[in-house]
Amino acid sequence: MPMRALLALFLLLPGLPAAALDLLPTTLQLPAEGGRTELWLHNPGPERWQGEVQILAWEQQLDAERLQPSDRILASPTRLDLAPGARQRVWLLPRSAVPVAAEQAYRIVLAPGRSSLPRYSLPLFQGAAAPSVRPAVRARVESNGSQTHLRLDNPGRLHARLDGLSFESVGGHRSVLLPGLAGYVLAGRERRWTLPARRDGYLGGRFRARLQDGREVVLDAWDPSIAVNPPAGL
């Protein structure tokens, strides 16, 4: 059954008014060599929903998400007008048929015509979605004295979607840090997330999370043991 777009990475405006949309799927995939994929919209509310589809190239830096308008992905239609109860299919396809050498990440944004309504953002990835390839995300805890951060590195060629992030202490006690969607680490990128304070500073334990295929994995440490303070020069 459809999931509210709140299950996407973020809902750009707070609150979920009556004019919300159902979106399916909430993660989109295009093959490396082209092809197309479809996004279905459903307006279950009593009001008409009008807006447009925007395509944004998605890049990540250590502490920031970078979104820029892109013409590499085409949407059809781009203008949306859904009466109450109506459904609409949006086709998404690459402008070029040349295969991409590395996974490309985008955000598909549904921007309403009324500023009082929420904008929705869904991830789209173009590249080989090999089910046998598991993202190899590495984790390190960093502390600057006032804040503690979890630094994640994804050296692989496939993005990592992390759900249910938890920490398991040396004694085996598990603490849930983020029960739902924790976030994404794009292929070849690093991200840093703030952690809640902990008396032992996360010393000696390990982090667990579920990947996009539903498997729970241990996030490998960059060093033989996860240290609170990173070595000099990192």
Residue ranges of predicted features:
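Terminal connector regions
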Residues: 95-137, 199-234
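Intrinsically disordered, low-complexity segments enriched in serine, threonine, and glycine
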Residues: 144-234
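Buried hydrophobic-core signal for structured, non-transmembrane domains
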Residues: 37-43, 85, 90-92, 106-111, ...
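N-terminal signal peptide c-region/cleavage motif recognized by signal peptidases
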Residues: 13-18
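Short acidic, flexible loop segments centered on an aromatic residue
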Residues: 45-67, 155-173
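Intrinsically disordered, low-complexity Pro/Gly/Ser/Thr-rich segments with frequent PxxP/GP/PP motifs
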Residues: 62-98, 172-201
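Beta-sheet-dominated interaction scaffolds and their linkers
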Residues: 19-45, 79, 133-144, 182
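Sec-dependent signal peptide recognition
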Residues: 2-9
